[in-house]
Amino acid sequence: MALTMLNGLLIKDSSPPMLHQISKTPQLDAFNYQSCFMQDLFAHFPEVLFIHRTYNPRGKVLYTFLVDGPRVQVEGPLARAVYFAIPTNEDARGLAQMFQVFKKFNPAWERVNTILVDPHFLLLPTLTMEFPTAEVLLSAFHICKFLQGKFYQLPLEQPVQRLLLSSLQSTMCSATAGNLRKLYTLLNNCIPSSRLPELHSHWLLNDRIWLAHRWRSRAQSSRYFQSLEIMAHILSQFFGTTPFEKQGMASVFRYMQQNSSDKASLSLAETPQDSHTPSEASAENPNTEQLVEARIQHSLNAICTGPAAQLCLGELAVVQKSMHLIGSGSEKMSIQILEDTHTVQPQPPASCSCYFNQAFHLPCRHILAMLSARQQVLQPDMLPAQWTSGCASSLDSILGSKWSASLDKHLAVTLLTEEVGRLLQHCSEEEFERRYSTLRELADNWIGPYEQVQL
């Protein structure tokens, strides 16, 4: 097959881009892309290479290479991206070809010291063969995502699930040996022994993994994970939802063009045959629906923090492509978008049964579709306070604060008190009396009957 430029994309840069494609069909057989800006960025920071993989419905995988490490001070979800590639096949030969193309255009590859990968990356021998002087490690971000997924998959009670997710988030932002050991112990206590091997909890005790991440402060860790979460969501949204690799990559490049903070000099223009899809043609004549969506976009930017707005705007982009209201009632609405059907609870704070809303507690594509259908906009009481723009400064001060033993104890007591109170409120009268008597007996035995304990 002939080597051709990617149909439908023109990347403007100071010198010709390095872009390779095999095949003229919407399904790319192989694809490698690096702009001169990306090449220059990698040349400046080659020491640590972060590899993220995104699969589409056809099973093709997009490899995104990002620079990482203490010297990299670049903001934006895709600002650290230095290479995009889709191998012909995800086997030893296909990956070897992909890495060899990368090395051909990047002489600085010899200075790569560390490569961070996800736990499902199986072709490690190929990676070590192509980068013989680099140490290959699991990335803290991918371990975090792996454990999060397991917590949602395992049949855990909600209080236990919330405790594990909260502890995981706290540990990732302060990955000291002590905190990792605490999380390891918590997993051993909360996860059934038969399912514990699935979690690979021994990763938490591998200090070499965490040395590559531990240099970050608590605030830096929070921003780092948030940025990578948004990056993964963007790639999944644009590339992972379409079986056509060409269309997926065009969407990724379009996002990078529209978000100048990610890559200011990247621009994209479409060929005539691709530039007038039905949805884009209708955009030339704004109607009521489009005006409503514009108002929703404005309300997101006005109410949410920057990262929250970016996540929700990505969800809104899906709504703009395809939305179908399949049922409506006074209490609940059923929203179907593309392949998903989920139940939306519109009363503040709005909630949805989809993973995005359950994980981030932010307005998802289904909630935004509901707002669009009702010609409404986002209201501040529809999302948690920590995601509102007014709370951004207070969050930064909390994330930047130092840990203290007294605060840790206070938080533990507060969480326990809230959980006990919740359990007492949501039980029968008979169960309440039994639980209250048990608590009364525990309190009296602990402090002594000579001192009345207020329960």
Swiss-Prot record:
InterPro entries: Zinc_finger_SWIM, Znf_SWIM, ZSWIM1-3_helical, ZSWIM1-3_RNaseH-like, ZSWIM1/3_C
Top-level taxon of origin: Eukaryota
Entry GO MF terms: zinc ion binding
Pfam families reported for this sequence: SWIM, ZSWIM1-3_C, ZSWIM1-3_helical, ZSWIM1-3_RNaseH-like
Source species of the chain: Mus musculus
Name listed for the protein in its UniProt record: Zinc finger SWIM domain-containing protein 1
PROSITE patterns referenced in this protein's UniProt entry, alphabetically: ZF_SWIM
Gene: Zswim1
UniProt KW keywords: Metal-binding, Zinc, Zinc-finger
Zinc finger SWIM-type: from-to: 333-375
Residues passing through the membrane, by range: none
N-terminal signal peptide: none
Stretches the record annotates as Disordered: 264-288
CC per GO annotation: nucleus
Record carries keyword Cytoplasm: no
